[in-house]
């Protein structure tokens, strides 16, 4: 998880907005799944952050802003997407939007880690 966040920062610093977004998606997904493992059993093979958060009980503890963030980051799971979909997503990203995404990812990551400490 921490490595993915470092990779996201490196990608951001080199102007790779789309792949910064993908790594942010990975950070959130892996952190949610870590929480799931502490609360339940093996996490499901899903990439839907909202479903993972609901399944492990975190969703009801989230602010509306955090829930909106989960909804917005869905589109950044580009690993298996067709090139035209990647291109469409890439056109929505720039330094400003990706910087905000990276900061929100760091905040969500830290928040989930705090919730893990409470377990």
Give the ranges of each region predicted by the language model.
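Terminal alpha-helical segments
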Residues: 1-119
